[in-house]
């Protein structure tokens, strides 16, 4: 029986599980949206929510506690300057877990874990990627046109 055995083991030993969750939480705070398995998303949710609550406090002690958990200083800066102010009047529930299908190898259920209110930033990132893709496509078409023009200028049979 699993009475009073809360939490997720994730098939790992303690240090590996702790490292995995710290990395996942850091990625969520840096990227706003991460795809992972549903179990890992559910395991990471309370950690992210506690860190956002620390970020809302905003004092030095909270910053040091966040720095002790997160992997990078950039993540701490982003947490306190960008992420936490979004949720000033909200008491918890900062994340959304959206199921996204199944993993190919082992059939594990995948999910996106994302911060609420990050839709605008995610749309901007998506639009920027689309513009970069379009620019690359235009450059490729231009290069192909130049190449065809160069090939078209030469005699096809050569000098025989």
Swiss-Prot record:
Residues 123-160 are annotated as: Disordered. One of its GO terms (biological process) is translation. It comes from the Bacteria. GO terms for cellular component: cytosolic large ribosomal subunit. Residues 123-141 have a biased composition (Basic and acidic residues). GO terms for molecular function: structural constituent of ribosome. It holds the Pfam family Ribosomal_L17. InterPro entries: Ribosomal_bL17, Ribosomal_bL17_sf. Residues 142-152 have a biased composition (Low complexity). Keywords: Ribonucleoprotein, Ribosomal protein. PANTHER family: LARGE RIBOSOMAL SUBUNIT PROTEIN BL17M (PTHR14413:SF16), RIBOSOMAL PROTEIN L17 (PTHR14413). Belongs to the bacterial ribosomal protein bL17 family. Part of the 50S ribosomal subunit. Contacts protein L32. This is Large ribosomal subunit protein bL17. It comes from Acidobacterium capsulatum (strain ATCC 51196 / DSM 11244 / BCRC 80197 / JCM 7670 / NBRC 15755 / NCIMB 13165 / 161). The gene is rplQ.
